[in-house]
A protein has these predicted regions:
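Conserved alpha-helical scaffold flanking the Walker A/P-loop in AAA+ ATPase domains
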Residues: 1-3, 50-51
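Conserved strand-helix element at the start of the C-terminal RecA-like helicase core
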Residues: 2, 6-26, 31, 35-38
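Short secondary-structure boundary segments
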Residues: 15, 65-66, 135
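Short Asp/Glu-rich motifs
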Residues: 17, 47-48, 143
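Positions that flank functional sites
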Residues: 18, 43, 69, 138-139
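Conserved RecA-like helicase motor core of SF1/SF2 enzymes
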Residues: 26-129
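Arginine-glycine-biased low-complexity disordered regions
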Residues: 104-191
């Protein structure tokens, strides 16, 4: 839900173990996102391939452990998501510092449960970090945010049509109407 609500153009997602990196990567891929993992098991050639995909904008989400992510330089990175918070302040600062580099703005999000929250608050106090606490977006929040985003995108495309595109669109209006008439066909549109 966070990824759907935030809609980051790119994100580095941190996990504490390789097993969790594998899990998060597979879940993202099954949801249709461009995601790959960055672990110490990758060969140097594979690492270079993954980084090149990120830099060219062909890979949206890179899921990594702290150890593997040392030295990665991704200046265009918009988001860091800490799927699991680190135990140490230095690791938190290293992770969060991967976004908003070279004067650019960035967003760092840390997911915590009630127990992890107290540890994160200790890190924030020790390092004078101002945290902004927010609940996870609800399904209704995500639906509202995504629908606003899609409507704005479609309206912009509608305003930018030329004569040929208007003519072509007219041919598909009956199909669009028929797809919105039944639940099964509406599901096709939601895909």
């Amino acid at each position: 839900r966070i990824i759907e609500a935030e809609n980051p153009p790119s994100a580095l997602i941190f996990c504490n173990t390789k097993a969790r990196v594998d899990y998060v990567t597979v879940v993202l891929q099954r949801f249709g996102y461009d995601a790959d993992e960055w672990t110490s098991d990758l060969s140097q050639a594979a690492r270079e391939q993954v980084l090149e995909r990120v830099r060219r904008g062909k890979l949206r989400f890179l899921v990594a452990t702290d150890v593997a992510a040392r030295g990665i330089d991704l200046p265009e990175l918009s988001h860091v998501i800490q799927y699991e918070p680190p135990d140490e302040a230095e690791a938190y600062i290293h992770r969060a510092g991967r976004t908003g580099r070279a004067g650019a703005s960035g967003t760092a999000i840390t997911l915590v449960n009630a127990v992890e929250r107290s540890g994160l608050l200790r890190i924030a106090k020790r390092c004078s970090i101002a945290l902004q606490e927010q609940p996870l977006p609800s399904d209704e929040d995500v639906e509202r945010i995504v629908s606003q985003r899609i409507i704005a995108l479609l309206e912009a495309r509608l305003r930018g049509r030329d004569r040929l595109q208007i003519e072509r669109m007219q041919r598909f209006l009956p199909l669009a109407r028929s797809l919105s008439e039944s639940a099964d066909e509406t599901s096709l549109l939601a895909m």
